[in-house]
Regions:
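PLP-dependent amino-acid enzyme catalytic core
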Residues: 1-296
Length: 296
């Protein structure tokens, strides 16, 4: 008997139908539970993809130091992958990210470099690149690395097509690095060009962990605008309220970006009929307990 390793359990996450939260009109709303991945988020997929493909090309080897700018989930997933495969991991992130995220990264053995929250992810990316230029490590660069969306082209997209028996009509995803929506869109559009791909962005002035609207100079290089059919904005208040509703009404303990995406999915469901709408639930709510989104 051959026993499996942790890498084998990244992906193949459940797809569940919402039972109590719905917009009627004969629509089916489905949640892809990416929090069921080993390190707890959708970012397990690209993290493992980037590390293992870089190894296969001879770009990195166990014992090397990896550096990455992150707002949370990619950092956690890379810290897990580094622990599994024998790398030192340095993560650069804004200091205002939740304490749960920081503790989880450190639990996996990662070193954290915190930057002022006023500088945001833009400053984190700049500092990571400066550290690389100083010879302190290798950046896998989730924002420009094609192995990020490939993980979803080869994993998330085929899973959704199979799990819906090809009936999916809408795919809704929050947008951060954009790897999830880029890779999944590419696969689904190859199967059925009529599938509507919907990207969620924060409203002006809203701060939602995991959802970004990047300045043009920092727009991820993996992002291809034509792969998204609709851009929908969501407020912080609506994202947080839907996050609480998912827990209380569906038993889905999700993060705030997942609440934002599901709010948009419900908005779409109120506008269409006989649709099969899939929304990505990026991670779990236990990473946000200190943020106040859930009642104490």
């Amino acid at each position: 008997m051959e026993f499996r390793t942790l890498e084998d359990y990244v992906g193949r996450t459940p797809l569940v139908r919402l039972k109590r939260i719905n917009a009627g009109r004969n629509n089916v709303i489905l949640a892809k539970l990416e929090g069921n991945n080993p390190a707890g988020s959708v970012k397990d997929r690209p993290a493992l993809s980037m590390v293992m493909r870089a190894e296969a090309r001879g770009r990195i080897k166990p014992g090397d130091t990896l550096i990455e700018a992150t707002s949370g989930n990619t950092g956690i997933a890379l810290a897990m992958a580094a622990a599994m495969r024998g790398y030192r991991m340095i993560l650069v992130m804004p200091e205002n990210q939740s304490v749960e995220r920081r503790q989880t990264m450190r639990a996996f053995g990662a070193e954290l470099v915190l930057v002022p929250s006023s500088g945001g992810m833009e400053m984190a990316r700049d500092i990571a690149e400066k550290m690389r230029d100083e010879g302190r490590g290798i950046i896998l660069d989730q924002f420009a690395n094609p192995d990020n969306p490939v993980a979803h082209y080869e994993g998330t997209g085929p899973e959704l097509w199979e799990q819906t028996d090809g009936r999916i009509t809408h795919f809704v995803s929050s947008m951060g690095t954009t790897g999830t929506i880029m890779g999944t869109s590419r696969f689904l559009k190859e199967r059925n060009p009529d599938i509507c791909i919907v990207g969620c962005e924060p409203e002006e002035g809203s701060s939602i962990p995991g959802i970004r609207k990047w300045p043009e100079a920092y727009l991820p290089k993996i992002f291809e605008r034509p792969r998204v059919d609709r851009f929908e904005r969501v407020s912080q208040a609506d994202a947080e309220e839907m996050t609480r509703r998912l827990a209380r009404e569906e038993g889905i303990f999700a993060g705030i970006s997942s609440g934002g995406a599901m709010h948009v999915a419900l908005r779409i469901a109120s506008q269409v009929e006989n649709a099969v709408i899939v929304s990505i639930v990026c991670d779990r709510g236990d990473r946000y307990l200190s943020t106040g989104v859930f009642p104490a």
